[in-house]
């Protein structure tokens, strides 16, 4: 890899570290190609991406960023899983780690916050953005449904009483 290629990789990694909602750093020594493809597929399905980069280039890219604290994690065979959604990549990486002993989460970053392995696992347990939006929408819609039910209830009760009177008269 020549100098121009290295500079391009550093620039790409810098954009990843600056713009991603979450970055998960893990060791992947011992994973097969099939395992790596599975990891990439899971993270991609969650809306993220996976990247293997030279540690030295990743450390250069991290220098001067808000998440420079994760540069200490860049030792050995490291892989980055990242996504714009602050939960997606962490959730996919955590699920993959539970099934593969050779994939060891070291830590990561969420926004400007540096996370250890337990922090990444805690983020993975959080509901995704879509789940939060749907639960908020459900909470907002529930009072309207209750009001509509309350408005319609007296008419339904009157109809029920009239029906009962009619049955007794017959």
UniProtKB/Swiss-Prot annotation:
Keywords: Ribonucleoprotein, Ribosomal protein, RNA-binding, rRNA-binding. Transmembrane segments: none annotated. GO terms for biological process: translation. GO terms for molecular function: large ribosomal subunit rRNA binding; structural constituent of ribosome. InterPro entries: Ribosomal_uL10, Ribosomal_uL10-like_sf, Ribosomal_uL10_bac, Ribosomal_uL10_bac_type, Ribosomal_uL10_CS_bac. GO terms for cellular component: large ribosomal subunit. The keyword Ribosomal protein applies. Part of the ribosomal stalk of the 50S ribosomal subunit. The N-terminus interacts with L11 and the large rRNA to form the base of the stalk. The C-terminus forms an elongated spine to which L12 dimers bind in a sequential fashion forming a multimeric L10(L12)X complex. Belongs to the universal ribosomal protein uL10 family. Forms part of the ribosomal stalk, playing a central role in the interaction of the ribosome with GTP-bound translation factors. This is Large ribosomal subunit protein uL10.
């Amino acid at each position: 890899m020549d100098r121009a290629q290295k500079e391009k990789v550093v620039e790409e990694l810098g954009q990843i570290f600056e713009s991603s909602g979450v970055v998960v750093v893990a060791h992947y020594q011992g994973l097969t190609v099939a395992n790596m493809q599975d990891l990439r597929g899971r993270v991609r399905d969650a809306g993220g991406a996976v990247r293997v980069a030279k540690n030295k280039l990743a450390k250069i890219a991290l220098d001067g960023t808000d998440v420079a604290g994760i540069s200490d994690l860049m030792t050995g065979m490291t892989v980055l899983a990242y996504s714009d959604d602050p939960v997606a990549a962490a959730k996919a990486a955590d699920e993959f780690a539970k099934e593969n002993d050779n994939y060891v989460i070291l830590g990561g970053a969420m926004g400007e916050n540096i996370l250890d392995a337990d922090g990444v696992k805690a983020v993975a347990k959080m509901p995704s953005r879509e789940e939060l939006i749907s639960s908020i929408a459900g909470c907002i819609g529930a009072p309207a449904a209750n009001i509509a039910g309350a408005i319609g209830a007296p008419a339904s009760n009157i109809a029920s009483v009239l029906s009962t009177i009619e049955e007794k008269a017959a």
